[in-house]
């Protein structure tokens, strides 16, 4: 697999888009994932992303989208988020990337007012619609497994059940190693995602709260997970996810530390290449 970086690491530290893309290549990454809202960026920014990545010979693999409104109980909110997610898919196509990383969100009101089964059905219906659009563009959607108690997809079993029920060839899973650890999902559970996973995120945490730290800064035992991921035979990328560097002025060192640590892990797991 290739080693990538989600470019939000740079943006959240106030670095300009093209600078971040150039630095990603300079550090040694094979690929890049883009965190950008197509409803917020203009045509110039879209072209800048595409052209700078081409110039650096840095393929874009994924575009990240958080769309919690897809499972809102208000149809008008759902319609907006469907159209917004379609705009994301169009951006994925425009950037010549492979997939849309999609975060669905959580059950509302502690699962006590709106029946959980209703939100589950809503998610299935709307994800199928989006998967149809993705398939028409030759793309795929990678659903994020979130580690929070009320997250719709917060375990491998829930992810597998959702994908099986959706039964759509363009709807797949993303594996986030830190999220698996936080959700108390063991490495062997990853085997259930054979043929269902197309993308991977990697970061560390303290074992208690969501952290997105450079590997080695927390408590995650990565190698057992990486060996199971290798066995899946995914033709894709493992992207480092770093959020909110504690010292924004030293974000380059933060990213280099994450790159070096992850590169060593992938080499030990015989996974990069």
Regions found by a protein language model. Give the residues of each.
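Histidine-acidic metal/acid-base catalytic patches
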Residues: 1-27, 153-172, 178-273
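Active-site acidic/histidine proton-transfer and metal-coordination neighborhood
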Residues: 11, 16, 55, 71-172, ...
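Glycine-rich, proline-tolerant flexible connector loops at the mouths of alpha/beta enzymes
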Residues: 33-54, 107-114, 210
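Short active-site-adjacent helix-start/loop capping segments
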Residues: 41-43, 69-73, 248
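Metal-dependent catalytic neighborhoods of phosphoester/phosphodiester hydrolases
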Residues: 42-47, 78-80, 249-250
């Amino acid at each position: 697999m290739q080693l990538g970086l989600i470019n939000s690491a740079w943006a959240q530290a106030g670095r300009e888009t093209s600078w971040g893309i150039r630095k990603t290549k300079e550090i040694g990454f094979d690929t890049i994932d883009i965190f950008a809202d197509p409803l917020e960026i203009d045509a110039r920014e879209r072209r800048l992303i595409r052209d700078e990545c081409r110039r650096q010979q840095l393929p874009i693999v994924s575009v990240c989208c958080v769309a919690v409104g897809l499972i809102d109980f208000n149809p008008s909110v759902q319609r907006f988020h469907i159209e917004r997610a379609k705009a994301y898919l169009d951006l994925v196509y425009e950037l010549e990337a492979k997939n849309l990383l999609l975060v669905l969100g959580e059950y509302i009101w502690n699962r006590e007012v709106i029946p959980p089964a209703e939100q589950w059905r809503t998610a299935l219906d709307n994800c199928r619609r989006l998967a149809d659009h993705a398939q028409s563009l030759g793309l795929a959607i990678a659903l994020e497994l979130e580690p929070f108690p009320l997250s719709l997809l917060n375990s491998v079993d829930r992810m597998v059940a959702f994908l099986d029920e959706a039964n759509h060839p363009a709807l797949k899973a993303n594996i986030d190693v830190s999220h698996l650890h936080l959700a108390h999902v063991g490495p062997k559970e990853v085997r259930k995602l054979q043929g269902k996973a197309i993308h991977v995120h990697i970061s560390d945490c303290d074992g208690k709260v969501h952290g997105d730290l450079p590997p080695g800064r927390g408590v995650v035992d990565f190698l057992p997970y990486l060996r199971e991921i290798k066995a899946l035979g995914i033709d894709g990328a493992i992207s480092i996810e770093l959020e909110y560097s504690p010292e924004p002025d030293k974000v380059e060192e933060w990213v280099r530390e994450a790159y070096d640590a992850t590169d060593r892990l992938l080499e030990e797991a015989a996974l990069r290449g």
